[in-house]
Amino acid sequence: MASEIHMTGPMCLIENTNGRLMANPEALKILSAITQPMVVVAIVGLYRTGKSYLMNKLAGKKKGFSLGSTVQSHTKGIWMWCVPHPKKPGHILVLLDTEGLGDVEKGDNQNDSWIFALAVLLSSTFVYNSIGTINQQAMDQLYYVTELTHRIRSKSSPDENENEVEDSADFVSFFPDFVWTLRDFSLDLEADGQPLTPDEYLTYSLKLKKGTSQKDETFNLPRLCIRKFFPKKKCFVFDRPVHRRKLAQLEKLQDEELDPEFVQQVADFCSYIFSNSKTKTLSGGIQVNGPRLESLVLTYVNAISSGDLPCMENAVLALAQIENSAAVQKAIAHYEQQMGQKVQLPTETLQELLDLHRDSEREAIEVFIRSSFKDVDHLFQKELAAQLEKKRDDFCKQNQEASSDRCSALLQVIFSPLEEEVKAGIYSKPGGYRLFVQKLQDLKKKYYEEPRKGIQAEEILQTYLKSKESMTDAILQTDQTLTEKEKEIEVERVKAESAQASAKMLQEMQRKNEQMMEQKERSYQEHLKQLTEKMENDRVQLLKEQERTLALKLQEQEQLLKEGFQKESRIMKNEIQDLQTKMRRRKACTIS
């Protein structure tokens, strides 16, 4: 059942205390209760640039994230506000407001770089907010983007000869969409006398300079990083909302008191975010919900705190460990529920129980397959198989015990009157043995006619009859109407009957063993069938993701070539060839 969101305001998600980042347990608890998929929008920018105002607008509130009206930075760490998505039913909009970059009070660029990296890692849409035009100063202030190769790893164990830049070639596959918001923008949008849209202005501003000097490289590096890491880009410009003196009361002012152009620009920005920001997903198309976002936050923050680099692959594997373990328990619970509803012990035959087990097992595997992902070496599915086998054996044992109890109770009811008659000496007389045998046959017939005795019916009966052999023999020996020869013949008949019953029981035992072996093979085949289907689906999903990444890289390479940057185009071409090689291997991969 969908969880309800009752966040009346933002809460600190990642605290920044004395330069140390820590996840806030209260915020994590809120995330852990949200089961719906999440669209995560993070905003980053220099302090005192009005980031919080835009986030409050996205939340549909006038107040929430602290605006602050002095040169002092208000937001510390990363703050979170979860609200129902206004355009996507069944989705949650998660707004992440970050502390201002370049706060003079901190004097620690390291800290800013981690905040920037975390915002990128956690979001599906990354908003960079700045004042004025995109000039070199604005680009210099965005040097954090050039730090990402030193702050994030995509793979946990990159090849030994693979450097940070090569590892960063995978960033595009999981990085968010990029939105640049330009505040207090007062210039006309044009280049070479031609009017530009905000998006064209951004593309124009990201053009590279030809040249190999240090100055040229400094100019090009942030632009190259933005183009390479964030292929999907959008730009919005905002006029100054009010006169500078009224900015301090911005959250108290009505829209009618603001510049109409600004009001429309904010509305356009919000509309774009609501309609175009995608659901946060992980490799394999896994949609992020509250518990998954909670796990990502913990994994990344713990990595930073311990001096490691946040790693996308490690974060996904840590999440998979948690979810796959839960998937095993969910599958077992489903199996137990189904067996509890369907099975009535004792079953008439072992096969009846095994058929019910097979149906419930198939459903349990389906539950696991739906709920699991990244099950490296299929360890969790093997664990599920072992637990299901144990559950099956437990049911077989319970079935056996239920049958034994039922049959023992029946024997007591059916045969106790005969035992009482024997004790009373009714059969200790001439011709008594034949009467006894006839009565015994009648009672055995009555026993066989009783329903739902289960799989122990014959064994329990034969054990009972064997325990009464001395009583039967005593009646035989005292019957004076029988000759010694007739007694010998009768003894042999009883022995033969007993031997025949034993042989029948042995046959039955062998048949049960064969049925159990057949069931084990069927279980193995069912696991293999569903696993094969899942692996094929995962392969197709990964190929789709790689094809999307390939298209974006080809587009960027073509643009670099068009602009005349041969060296950068060659680097991109190498990345493309590496990706195409991986895709060819993936396409050729067959599951045997």
UniProtKB/Swiss-Prot annotation:
Gene3D superfamilies: Guanylate-binding protein, C-terminal domain, P-loop containing nucleotide triphosphate hydrolases
BP GO annotations: cellular response to interleukin-1; cellular response to tumor necrosis factor; cellular response to type II interferon; cytolysis in another organism; defense response to bacterium; defense response to protozoan; defense response to virus; innate immune response
Modified residues (Cysteine methyl ester): C589
Topology of the protein relative to the lipid bilayer: Lipid-anchor
One Gene Ontology term of the molecular function aspect: GTPase activity
E.C. numbers: 3.6.1.-, 3.6.5.-
Induction pattern: By IFNG during macrophage activation, and by TNF and IL1B.
Keyword annotations of the record: Antiviral defense, Cell membrane, Cytoplasm, Cytoplasmic vesicle, Golgi apparatus, GTP-binding, Hydrolase, Immunity, Innate immunity, Isopeptide bond, Lipoprotein, Membrane, Methylation, Nucleotide-binding, Phosphoprotein, Prenylation, Secreted, Ubl conjugation
Subcellular location(s) per record: Cytoplasmic vesicle membrane; Golgi apparatus membrane; Cell membrane; Cytoplasm, Cytosol
Keyword Kinase applies: no
Span of domain GB1/RHD3-type G: 35-278
Reaction(s) the record says it catalyses: GTP + H2O = GDP + phosphate + H(+); GDP + H2O = GMP + phosphate + H(+)
GO cellular component terms listed in the entry, alphabetical order: actin cytoskeleton; cytoplasm; cytoplasmic vesicle; cytoplasmic vesicle membrane; cytosol; extracellular region; Golgi apparatus; Golgi membrane
Lipid moiety-binding residues (S-farnesyl cysteine): C589
Record location of the (Microbial infection) Glycyl lysine isopeptide (Lys-Gly) (interchain with G-Cter in ubiquitin) cross-link: K207, K209, K210, K382, K562, K567, K573, K587
Residues involved in GTP binding: 45-52, 67-69, 97-101
UniProt key word Nucleotide-binding: yes
Family matches, as CDD domains: GBP (cd01851), GBP_C (cd16269)
Modification Phosphoserine, positions: S156
Quaternary structure and partners: Homodimer; homodimerization occurs upon GTP-binding and is required for the second hydrolysis step from GDP to GMP. Undergoes conformational changes and oligomerization upon GTP-binding and hydrolysis. Heterodimer with other family members, including GBP2, GBP3, GBP4 and GBP5. Dimerization regulates subcellular location to membranous structures. Interacts with SQSTM1. Interacts (when phosphorylated) with 14-3-3 protein sigma (SFN); leading to GBP1 retention in the cytosol and inactivation.
Job description of the protein: Interferon (IFN)-inducible GTPase that plays important roles in innate immunity against a diverse range of bacterial, viral and protozoan pathogens. Hydrolyzes GTP to GMP in two consecutive cleavage reactions: GTP is first hydrolyzed to GDP and then to GMP in a processive manner. Following infection, recruited to the pathogen-containing vacuoles or vacuole-escaped bacteria and promotes both inflammasome assembly and autophagy. Acts as a positive regulator of inflammasome assembly by facilitating the detection of inflammasome ligands from pathogens.
Alphabetical list of PANTHER family matching this protein: GUANYLATE BINDING PROTEIN (PTHR10751)
Family in the record: Belongs to the TRAFAC class dynamin-like GTPase superfamily. GB1/RHD3 GTPase family. GB1 subfamily.
Name by which UniProt lists this protein: Guanylate-binding protein 1
Organism for this UniProt entry: Homo sapiens
Lineage of origin: Eukaryota, Metazoa, Chordata, Craniata, Vertebrata
